């Protein structure tokens, strides 16, 4: 069965195993998520569980939002997301970090850090030209393509805004779960800046 939870990236640290192995980990704070709605094929056309994370002040919420969370007897939420292939949950039920255990393999989704306007070398990994004095080609994007179409094809790798994209890293290992602090430690790094929203769910390709 698929498991999922929403959390907030705290930062990175390091831990040591009993054998002395050094492991870099990312700390994810995941306060209890509340099930706001259970969607079914009969009523909504697809099956999913809608969960809310991070309480929001009521003064910042409109009446439809307040009415929606009232069914789950909880406060308005800043983030609302859906998970598919999750069964056995009811409206108002809480999802805690204890859903996961050390050794679980998960997929982690976040929004990558924004880098601003960048050139093709940093943005797309292209090679630069000779830096010699006689060269007139250093860090330019290069050819725009053949002459015949009289235009530049869509998708051409050019300079532009870099980062700020939805990124998923697959098959990361849960190193430790700390229920009393609502914290999950995940091996390696995960996308996003500190305090950004992180989605953790069971790995799709685990064991493949």
Curated annotation (Swiss-Prot):
Which InterPro entries does the record associate with it?
Ribosomal_uL3 (IPR000597), Ribosomal_uL3_bac/org-type (IPR019927), Ribosomal_uL3_CS (IPR019926), Transl_B-barrel_sf (IPR009000)
Q: Which domain of life is it from?
A: Bacteria
Question: One biological process GO term for this chain?
Answer: translation
The answer, when asked if Ion transport is one of the entry's keywords, is no
- Specify where the region named Disordered lies, as residue ranges: 124-145
What are the UniProt keywords, alphabetically?
Answer: Ribonucleoprotein, Ribosomal protein, RNA-binding, rRNA-binding
Q: Name one GO cellular component term.
A: cytosolic large ribosomal subunit
Question: Which residues are the signal sequence here?
Answer: none
* Pfam families named in the record: Ribosomal_L3
- Output the HAMAP family linked to this UniProt entry: Ribosomal_uL3_B (MF_01325_B)
Protein family: Belongs to the universal ribosomal protein uL3 family.
Function, in words: One of the primary rRNA binding proteins, it binds directly near the 3'-end of the 23S rRNA, where it nucleates assembly of the 50S subunit.
What's the protein name?
A: Large ribosomal subunit protein uL3
Please report the organism this UniProt entry assigns to the protein: Streptococcus suis (strain 05ZYH33)
